[in-house]
């Protein structure tokens, strides 16, 4: 009898021990009511990590029972412990499943630095560490206004390699341009820097205009690429002064791609090119309205060439058919006015490529022009443009 009592006591003790153990261990028979994660969305740069932590109801179901998965491991992976690793740009959905319930986190991998103010953009530019092949990516999160008291160059890109996505936002500002130390400009590229601008509107405006200033300076050996969604409006001129859209220095390169557009109104130069500067048209368009030009008499190389000096006139390279409304004007006002003499032969001003041959349609989009009293006329009594093989040339008649 005594042995029987001992047996039942041992059995009760074992039962109690098992019951108590259930409070600390996952019970596969307990249904999951809900599961949530500490993040519903994540934005990471390539190589960055973040841990997702699940909360399960009831809490008797432990995190060890969660099964993790990624629908796009080429973008982001997840470990059995919920550690998310960003792999490459894109989006991926991370799913945490606990039995019949699941929760998700949308992971966006982007190597772009988001900026919303002038100060943030300056900092992003100054700290950029990208290379020519893999530039630092910056994206605007809103409209950026550059105050009139900004530094001489609002954004100086010194030897950096940067790509700015405007996010379809504009950069604007008033530039008080009067040929003094207070002259302002938006961007300056120096010391081999490269910059690509996409999905960005730039509007230049000023109380006084000067040929001394440009919205963007591309100094020697630097490269500026204008891509899809880029638009630069270089403003309205005042009297005979001009605001330059982009100034391209010696051995510097301006590339236009996609639907990029440069335009002006009444006066002003879209592009001012130095003698050995390069303008490559892979797409996009330049529209010179009324007296506006893409290259004017203020281009010293053009003036020297017209005077008979042996210098190189900057050449435009066309790599695709130009848009129908493109309008390129070479302003010969000073030469005609002062009766400069033209050296013998012809100057190549536009050339095609191995993959694209210029046509008569392209020729019709380039003009020689001069200002006259009361407006602008195309000038063809002393000069002419003509198609010669895969080049458009200028010569004296």
Which residues fall in each region the model found?
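Beta-strand-rich solenoid/repeat architectures in extracellular/passenger domains
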Residues: 169-183, 198-212, 224-242, 254, ...
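Extracellular beta-strand-rich solenoid/capping regions of secreted or surface-exposed proteins
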Residues: 146-163, 174-199, 203-224, 246-251
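Acidic Gly/Asp/Thr-rich repetitive segments characteristic of extracellular carbohydrate-active
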Residues: 59, 112-141
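C-terminal motif of bacterial Sec signal peptides marking the signal peptidase cleavage site
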Residues: 16-19
């Amino acid at each position: 009898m005594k042995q029987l009592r001992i047996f039942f006591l041992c059995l009760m003790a074992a039962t109690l021990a098992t019951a108590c153990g259930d409070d600390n261990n996952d019970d596969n028979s307990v249904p999951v009511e809900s599961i949530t994660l500490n993040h519903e969305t994540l934005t990471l740069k390539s190589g960055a990590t973040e841990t997702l932590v699940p909360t399960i109801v009831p809490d008797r179901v432990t995190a060890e029972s969660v099964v993790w998965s990624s629908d796009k491991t080429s973008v982001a992976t997840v470990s059995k412990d919920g550690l998310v690793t960003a792999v490459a740009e894109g989006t991926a959905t991370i799913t945490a499943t606990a039995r019949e319930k699941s929760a998700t986190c949308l992971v966006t991998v982007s190597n772009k630095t988001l900026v919303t103010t002038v100060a943030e953009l300056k900092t992003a530019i100054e700290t950029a560490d990208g290379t020519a092949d893999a530039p630092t990516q910056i994206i605007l999160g809103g409209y950026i206004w550059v105050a009139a008291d900004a530094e001489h160059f609002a954004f100086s890109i010194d030897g950096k390699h940067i790509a700015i996505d405007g996010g379809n936002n504009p950069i604007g500002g008033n530039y008080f341009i009067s040929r003094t130390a207070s002259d302002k400009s938006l961007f300056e590229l120096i010391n081999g820097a490269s910059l690509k601008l996409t999905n960005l509107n730039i509007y230049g405006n000023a109380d006084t205009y000067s040929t001394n200033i440009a919205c963007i300076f591309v100094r020697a050996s630097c490269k500026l690429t204008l891509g899809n969604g880029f638009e630069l409006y270089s403003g309205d001129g005042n009297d005979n002064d001009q605001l330059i859209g982009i100034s391209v220095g010696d051995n510097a390169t301006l590339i236009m791609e996609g639907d990029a557009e440069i335009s002006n109104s009444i006066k002003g130069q879209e592009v001012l090119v130095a003698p050995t500067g390069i303008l490559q048209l892979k797409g996009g368009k330049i529209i010179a309205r009324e007296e506006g030009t893409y290259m004017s008499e203020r281009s010293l190389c053009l003036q020297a060439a017209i005077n008979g000096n042996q210098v190189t006139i900057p050449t435009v390279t066309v790599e695709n058919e130009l848009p129908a409304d493109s309008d390129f004007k070479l302003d010969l006002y000073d030469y005609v006015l002062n009766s400069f003499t033209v050296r013998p032969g012809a100057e190549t001003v536009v050339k095609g490529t191995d993959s694209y041959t210029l046509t008569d349609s392209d020729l019709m989009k380039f003009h020689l022009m001069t200002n006259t009293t009361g407006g602008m006329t195309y000038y063809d009594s002393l000069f002419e443009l003509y198609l010669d093989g895969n080049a458009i040339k200028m010569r004296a008649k």
